[in-house]
Each structure stands twice: as structure tokens, then as C-alpha cells.
Amino acid sequence: MLKKEYLKNPYLVLFAMIILAYVFSVLCRFYWIWWASEFNEYFFNNQLMIISNDGYAFAEGARDMIAGFHQPNDLSYYGSSLSTLTYWLYKITPFSFESIILYMSTFLSSLVVIPIILLANEYKRPLMGFVAALLASVANSYYNRTMSGYYDTDMLVIVLPMFILFFMVRMILKKDFFSLIALPLFIGIYLWWYPSSYTLNVALIGLFLIYTLIFHRKEKIFYIAVILSSLTLSNIAWFYQSAIIVILFALFALEQKRLNFMIIGILGSATLIFLILSGGVDPILYQLKFYIFRNDESANLTQGFMYFNVNQTIQEVENVDFSEFMRRISGSEIVFLFSLFGFVWLLRKHKSMIMALPILVLGFLALKGGLRFTIYSVPVMALGFGFLLSEFKAILVKKYSQLTSNVCIVFATILTLAPVFIHIYNYKAPTVFSQNEASLLNQLKNIANREDYVVTWWDYGYPVRYYSDVKTLVDGGKHLGKDNFFPSFALSKDEQAAANMARLSVEYTEKSFYAPQNDILKSDILQAMMKDYNQSNVDLFLASLSKPDFKIDTPKTRDIYLYMPARMSLIFSTVASFSFINLDTGVLDKPFTFSTAYPLDVKNGEIYLSNGVVLSDDFRSFKIGDNVVSVNSIVEINSIKQGEYKITPIDDKAQFYIFYLKDSAIPYAQFILMDKTMFNSAYVQMFFLGNYDKNLFDLVINSRDAKVFKLKI
């Protein structure tokens, strides 16, 4: 009897659904923990390392907050939202720092089930919410960006807008004071957590205003909700925002009759004018330029040089095909189609769900802006599928028993989740760095000072700063080609040029932090160098850096290290592109070749490589299509650490070299095809061959995974 009473209590049923969905989401994310724990190379400091490159930026910020300080201009994320939350969790919980950053996403991202279930409950459809929560919490795109070890702001980047959507729908349906104050609260939290959400928040508030004008134009509480929400978009300090919002909320709650539509109109107009004057549209324009129109601001800033745009090389902002798009959102194409149909049906039944359109549309921008956006559509489409399944059950109940209907729904849910389970099983993401790489960088921390710089590619900027506690020129947050030009140049040009550019770029970068806002150092460091060295032709200036008699007039203020990891060989052609571009035209008109490969097959005296090259078994030539190309030399590398290699000359007039790596830390880089330009690059000569000028560099860390050189000039 007591059991039946519990089952009849809607709040207990709702609570049980939330707990079950949350536990389900967490357990699914623990699969990666179980799998990764089998590999010792994924551990550092007795804990699994994280799998998110950007996560190291927030980890560095949290580490510095725990220490209580950081170096000026070190690009630390000190005080950022995720770093701050991590700091407080470290202070109030008994867990280690490494454990906190590993598991935060596991537990926080699973909170998405709460607003989904609560939202469906507003429509008196608990089954819709429960099924949607199960699907949304582990759908491919959402799982990939919130799995265990994915330490990033993505862990709440969908949770918070779903709470905003829930309170908007609740406001429409109930018109209650709780929703009125909760709505701006969650918008404010979302903006603090993820400042790039500004555009989405504007879209949500704008649509809410339009909805109000169409369906509730005579109800004052909706206009007050728009005003309070809009105030969170302002650039004033949060405590001023909070004070104004609380005062206006209290005035409305206590003096509704005196706040007539004229006063509300004046308040609304004043709020709008204030937002425009405070630069409220600037964040929207930036997001559109970078992700949709793919513009690189560096060309505008420099008014001269046209650099390579880094967002063209990031997988997250590449366009995706429609099948992949559907799978990422709903786990499979068929579930996506059912979800889309269900969402349209849901809109027809409950017009307030139109408030979900900005979130859904942002996810659909993945077709143009890249796969990273698909995560936004996941919960909205899941609600559509949940609604469809709840309607299907209603039809079944009319024809069959309750038991039969429940069995059918359970079976359909399992079938829906099956592709997602397969994806979770197959998606075995490695940690950002291996244990050896992390240990090497931790060793560098004991060699370098906090004010010293490490010159390396931007992919490694955040981890290098976290493990070595140094400064870097670039990192995952620098998306302008003008920043990445310098490390690209230092790694892909000859040693002399690399040494000179490393010193110049670091010293000029430091000077730029203290330059006036209108100084050329703020807009383009390369142009500032040319100005100081009385050079007007960029090609001549860059060529002069290769000359031994080039004199650096800039005073040396700190030590500089070059970090050259083995893994960079997989992307070195991309790395080099940033400095081989024609700075006058923005066109990559200086062709070069650097291509890693592994053997696929051997037949008829030929070795078929993974990059499409067919290599003769005597290594004297290779074929690309029908073209046969001679090889200059074969370089057999027996030990990268010891610098043991053998060069076999073949044709001194040929332009290409074949590297055969017998000692490789990268499993998919057994062969490297490169031309003379790349062969003479600092990365190839110093890392693979161990050839470096002792007057320019000292080798301070040496392994087959990575080498670190200290600049002596």
C-alpha cells in the first residue's frame, strides 16, 4: 500500500527519474576511466591525465589561484570561471587536484538531465523528459565533449542554457515570481561561465521578447523578465547588476499596479540604449566573423601582411557532412529524423517550445561553422524524440495493456541508445600527453624560470605552461596567424634563422605588453621588428635572419627554450604553412613537402604507404600517381635520443628525402617524405638528427618523445 502511494506521488517519481538519468549518465562516462586505467602511459602523479588540450589552460589558472599568484603577462587563466570553480572544489573537498580536473566533467555535465526532465514535466510529460535525458546525456557530440577527462567549460555549456530554456517555458506557463528572478540569475551565471554565450543569450532574450509581443503583450511580468534578463548582458560589475535586478524585481513584486506600461517602456528603452553604448553587439560580430565568415582579424589589424588563418586548420571548425552531423546529434540517422519529426510535432502541441529554436539553430550551424556546434542541438532534438515516444505510448495504451506499452517503450529506448553505446565503447580518446611527455615538461620546470619562454607550436602551449610553469608565445586561445607565424618560422626554417627569430619574437612580445595601444607593437610585432631594423621588404628581412652576421640589437631579458616533440611530425606540414605563406598576398605559394606515413602493403617490389605514395623496395624512387620521382637520400634513424642515423645518398640532384624511423615514439610515422627545404629545417635537423649549432643552442632535455633546447644568444 505504501509502495503504491509513493508511486502516485508525482514529485517522488520526478525525483526518481532525475536520479536514475543522472546515475546513468555518470556510469556511461566511467567507461573511459575503466578503459584508460589499463594504460600506465596515461597516468601522471598517480592519476589519469585529462584528454582536453584547452583544459590545461584552466588547470594552469586553477593551479595559480591555489598558489596565490601568477607572472605578469603569462596568459594564465587566473580567475576564469572553470579555474575558479576548480579552485573552490580543491579548497573544500579532500580530493587531489588531478582527480578534481579528471572527474569534474563526469559529474557536472550529467546535470543536463535536470532541466530536461523539469522542462518536460511542465508539459505534464515525465516520460518525454526521462527518455530525452537518457539520450541527450550520452549522445555522441555531447559525450565527446563532456566525457571523463574532458576538463573544459563544455561541461556546463549546455546545462546552463537548458536551465534558461526551462525557466523561460515555466515563465510562459506559470507567470510566477520564482521564474522571474531565476531567469536573469541563470543568464548571468551562463555569461560568467562561458562569455562566448553572449550571442545565444541575446537570441534567447530577443525571441522571448518577440513571443511576448505576439502572445502576452498585455502582461507586464513578461516585459520585466526581458528587462531583468537584458541587464545581465551589460558590462557593469556583477554586484551592480545584481543590485539593480533585485531592486527592479522587488519594485515589481511590491508595486505592480504603479509600474504601468509607460514606465516599463522607459525602463526597456533605457536598458537597450545602455547595452548598445556599452558595446553589447561587439561579441556577436566577432563570433560571426570567426566561425561563420572565417575572417582572420590579423589582416585588418596589420593593414598590410596577410597571415595564415588558424581556424582553417582546426577540426572543430571544419564543415561536417550531413550523416556525421545527424549521428553526432542523435546517435544515428534514423533517431535524428524521428527526433526532428517529434520536435516539429512538439512545437505544434506546445508553442512555448519555440523558445528552444535559438539553441537548436546554433547546433545546426555546425553544417557551416564546424562540428563543435552540434552539441547545442543535442538536448532539444532529444526532447523531440522523447515527445514522439510519449505520444507513441499514448497510442499503445489505447490498444494494448499498460504492461505491453511499457515493454515497447523500454525496447524502443534500448534500440535508440544502442548506437550511442557502441560509440562510447569505440571512442577511446588518449590523454593529451603521455606520461613520458608530461614527465619531461615537469623536468623542464626545474630548469627554467617562470619568466622564461618556451617556443613551440600552439597545440602544446597550454600543457607546456601547466607542467613547466613557463611562458609561451602561442596557445590554443590564440587564433590569429600573426601570432603563430613566429613559432612556425622558428621550427621550420634553418637553425640560425630559428635562433634569431626565437629571440626577437620573445623580446618583442614582452615589449608589446607595455606599448601604447596605438603602437605598431600592438598590431603587428613583425612590422615592429622591421621598423627597428630599418627594413621595408619583409622577404629580405626574414632572409637576413639566416645570416650568421645578423646582429640582434634587442637586449636579452630572459632565457628561451625550444620544445620539439615527436608528435609534431604528424602536423609539421601545417606548422610550416604559417611561415611559408606569402605575407603580401596571403597565398601559400612556396611549395614544400613533409608527409608522414606507415606501410599498408608490400607487393610487386613496391611499398604502399598510407599517404598515397608508392615507394620502391630499394628506396631509390617513389610514385605519386603515374609520376616516378627520384630520391636524394635515404635516412635510417636508429635512435632519436642518441642521434644515431645513417644517410645513404642516391641522387644528389633529386629534391626529396625518405626518412625511415626504426626508433619512433609515434606509431603512425614510420616513414617521412620531405623535400630539401624541410630537411634543412630546425625541427628535422635538431630533433630527428641531433644536429645543432653548439654556439646557438644547448640540449637540456633529450628523449625520443621530445627534445628541449636552450637558446644561447
From Swiss-Prot:
Entry's family note: Belongs to the STT3 family.
Consequence when changing residue 53 to A: Reduced catalytic activity
Map motif DXD motif 2 onto the chain: 152-154
The cofactor(s) it depends on are:
Mg(2+); Mn(2+)
Q: What is the lineage of its organism?
A: Bacteria, Pseudomonadati, Campylobacterota, Epsilonproteobacteria, Campylobacterales
* Topological category with respect to the lipid bilayer: Multi-pass membrane protein
Q: Where does Mn(2+) bind?
A: 54, 152, 316
Please indicate the residue ranges that the annotation assigns to the motif WWDYG motif: 457-461
Query: Can you provide one Gene Ontology molecular function annotated for this UniProt record?
Result: glycosyltransferase activity
What reaction(s) does this enzyme catalyze?
tritrans,heptacis-undecaprenyl diphosphooligosaccharide + [protein]-L-asparagine = tritrans,heptacis-undecaprenyl diphosphate + a glycoprotein with the oligosaccharide chain attached by N-beta-D-glycosyl linkage to protein L-asparagine
Outline which residue ranges sit on the Cytoplasmic face. Answer: 1-11, 123-125, 175-176, 216-220, 255-260, 348-352, 397-406
Q: Which Pfam families match?
A: STT3, STT3-PglB_core, STT3_PglB_C
Q: Which residue spans belong to the Periplasmic compartment? A: 36-96, 145-152, 193-197, 234-237, 279-324, 370-373, 428-713
Q: Which residues are listed as membrane-spanning?
A: 12-35, 97-122, 126-144, 153-174, 177-192, 198-215, 221-233, 238-254, 261-278, 325-347, 353-369, 374-396, 407-427
Which residues bear the site annotation Important for catalytic activity? 145
Sugar-modified residues? 534
> What PANTHER family has UniProt attached to this entry?
DOLICHYL-DIPHOSPHOOLIGOSACCHARIDE--PROTEIN GLYCOSYLTRANSFERASE SUBUNIT (PTHR13872), DOLICHYL-DIPHOSPHOOLIGOSACCHARIDE--PROTEIN GLYCOSYLTRANSFERASE SUBUNIT STT3B (PTHR13872:SF1)
- Locate the motif TIXE motif: 313-316
What ranges does the record give for the region Interacts with target acceptor peptide in protein substrate, renumbered to this chain?
A: 457-459
The record's Gene Ontology cellular component field reads: plasma membrane
What is the name of this protein? Undecaprenyl-diphosphooligosaccharide--protein glycotransferase
GO BP of this protein: protein N-linked glycosylation
| Localization in the cell | Cell inner membrane
Sites binding [alpha-D-GalNAc-(1->4)]2-[beta-D-Glc-(1->3)]-[alpha-D-GalNAc-(1->4)]2-alpha-D-GalNAc-(1->3)-alpha-D-diNAcBac-tri-trans,hepta-cis-undecaprenyl diphosphate sit at: 194-196, 291, 372, 462
| Source organism (scientific name) | Campylobacter jejuni (strain RM1221)
